[in-house]
């Protein structure tokens, strides 16, 4: 497990974007060899998406041979609703890059048979050869995707009832009106993300500090679903200083002492212009 600590949100976002960029380019994707990327929504990854868009606009990175699978989607919210995760992804990322819309997979929260939709999503991931890099964020209660506290750590894509803490946190996106906030969602399972060949979790802000502490300094616990990634062979937690406030000083010092190693993963930043 790696813990990458940057000074602030912008630097953490840039490090994560550089890592994604380098992983895609090193993979050498092509017509018969797609890189498969798992993606989150929420406020945390916005900075990362902006940097990836910048790399694309500058000609360093193409998503032509990338397939994406999003973590979750609300149930019952129209696809074109401004707060649906379809809208989020297209407005904040997909419409700014060269990805084929047929390769951008997002769960349909309005499907006639929700369980069949979840099963089909799992099958699409298998057909794509599994996920090379799953990027995620977490809530203050340590949930990954919509795997709320108490979720099985071997769970698969399914329908979930949202915890009140999550509904309250999401109310800001619905004019503060709790009655407008969806109470159910389709989500990948913890096991779905664990199956990825690599996982990168973005954690920023003091309000996520206790969750980061639970994720790396205490044991694996289904009440803090992000802690499951202690058992993944290739996990990277990318955080800012504020997110480390609950960690032991020696933990922070240890991982900061490895930054010269971690930075070799993103420096130099590769470019498709160079023929990589």
From Swiss-Prot:
Record key words, sorted: Carbohydrate metabolism, Coiled coil, Cytoplasm, Hydrolase, Isomerase, Phosphoprotein
EC class of the enzyme, as a word: hydrolase
Modified residues (Phosphothreonine): 161
Coiled-coil residues: 105-130
Pathway participation: Nucleotide-sugar biosynthesis; UDP-N-acetyl-alpha-D-glucosamine biosynthesis; alpha-D-glucosamine 6-phosphate from D-fructose 6-phosphate: step 1/1
GO cellular component, as recorded: cytoplasm; cytosol; nucleus
Pfam families: Glucosamine_iso
Reaction equations catalysed: alpha-D-glucosamine 6-phosphate + H2O = beta-D-fructose 6-phosphate + NH4(+)
Tissues of expression: Ubiquitous, with highest expression detected in testis, ovary, placenta, and heart.
GO BP: carbohydrate metabolic process; glucosamine catabolic process; N-acetylglucosamine catabolic process; N-acetylneuraminate catabolic process; UDP-N-acetylglucosamine biosynthetic process
Active-site feature positions: 72, 141, 143, 148
E.C. code: 3.5.99.6
InterPro entries named among the record's database cross-references: Glc/Gal-6P_isomerase, Glucosamine6P_isomerase, Glucosamine6P_isomerase_CS, NagB/RpiA_transferase-like
Superkingdom per UniProt: Eukaryota
Subunit organization: Homohexamer.
UniProt similarity note: Belongs to the glucosamine/galactosamine-6-phosphate isomerase family.
HAMAP family for this protein: GlcN6P_deamin
The protein, known as: Glucosamine-6-phosphate deaminase 2
Source organism (scientific name): Homo sapiens
Record gene name: GNPDA2
């Amino acid at each position: 497990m790696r813990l990458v600590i940057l000074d602030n949100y912008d630097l953490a976002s840039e490090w994560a974007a550089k890592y994604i960029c380098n992983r895609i380019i090193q993979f050498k994707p092509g017509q018969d060899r797609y890189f498969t990327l798992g993606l989150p929504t929420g406020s945390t990854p916005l900075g990362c998406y902006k940097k990836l868009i910048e790399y694309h606009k500058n000609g360093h990175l193409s998503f032509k041979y990338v397939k994406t699978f999003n973590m979750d989607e609300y149930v019952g919210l129209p696809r074109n609703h401004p707060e649906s995760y379809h809208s989020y992804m297209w407005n904040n990322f997909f419409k700014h890059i060269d990805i084929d819309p047929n390769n951008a997979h997002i769960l349909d929260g309005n499907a006639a048979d929700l369980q069949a939709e979840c099963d089909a999503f799992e099958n699409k991931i298998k057909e794509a050869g599994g996920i090379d890099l799953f990027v995620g964020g977490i809530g203050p209660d340590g949930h990954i995707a919509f795997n709320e506290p108490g979720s099985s750590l071997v769970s698969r894509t399914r329908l979930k009832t949202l915890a009140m803490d999550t509904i309250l946190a999401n109310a800001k996106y619905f004019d503060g009106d709790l009655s407008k906030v969806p109470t159910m969602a389709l989500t990948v399972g913890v096991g779905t993300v664990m199956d990825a060949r690599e996982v990168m979790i973005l954690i920023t802000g003091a309000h996520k500090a206790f969750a980061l502490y639970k994720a790396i300094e205490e044991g694996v616990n289904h009440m803090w679903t992000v802690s499951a990634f202690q058992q993944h062979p290739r996990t990277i937690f990318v955080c800012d200083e504020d997110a480390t406030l609950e960690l032991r000083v020696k933990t922070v010092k240890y991982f900061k002492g490895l930054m010269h190693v971690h930075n070799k993963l993103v420096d130099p930043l590769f470019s498709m212009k160079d023929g990589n």
